[in-house]
């Protein structure tokens, strides 16, 4: 029934203008304004992820978007130059280095937050 369906995902933020600036300028993605006060975030496969305002927004406690990259260090360095702060984890099963990159336990990955506090990641392919 849904085999060839163009499903899409969405998430909430508490400030659409900050989200538009972050995803458009900081992340360098195509962001357009949609109907009913939502943003459309264009992703590489031609799909959109919708970003919608929610007055009582609570940030996701899990990674909502993963951005595959060829070189994790280049991506982390570039995003850091653009003001992104990476999350440093120091837990028994989750440790990152001083740059915020977890290495050697699956793909190299670094987590960070958007202005609404939602968790995102860059991970090395």
Descriptions of predicted regions:
Residues 1-2, 67, 76-125:
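Vicinal oxygen chelate
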Residues 1-18, 62-65, 123-125:
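N-terminal beta-strand motif that seeds the catalytic metal site of vicinal oxygen chelate
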Residues 15-16, 69-73:
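Helix N-cap motif at beta-to-alpha junctions
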Residues 22, 72-78:
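Short amphipathic alpha-helices within nucleic acid-binding modules
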Residues 47-50, 58-59:
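Short, charged/polar, Gly/Pro-enriched secondary-structure boundary elements
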Residues 57-70:
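Helix-adjacent hinge/juxtasegments
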């Amino acid at each position: 029934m849904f085999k060839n369906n163009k499903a899409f995902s969405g998430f909430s933020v508490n400030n659409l203008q900050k989200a538009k600036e972050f995803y458009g300028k900081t992340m360098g993605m195509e962001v357009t304004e949609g109907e009913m006060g939502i943003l459309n975030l264009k992703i590489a496969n031609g799909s959109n992820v919708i970003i919608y305002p929610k007055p009582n927004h609570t940030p996701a406690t899990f990674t909502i978007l993963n951005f595959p990259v060829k070189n994790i260090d280049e991506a982390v360095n570039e995003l850091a130059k653009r003001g992104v702060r990476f999350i440093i984890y120091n837990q028994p099963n989750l440790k990152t280095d001083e740059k915020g990159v977890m290495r050697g336990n699956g793909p190299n990955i670094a987590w960070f937050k958007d202005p609404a506090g939602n968790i995102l990641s860059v991970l090395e392919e």
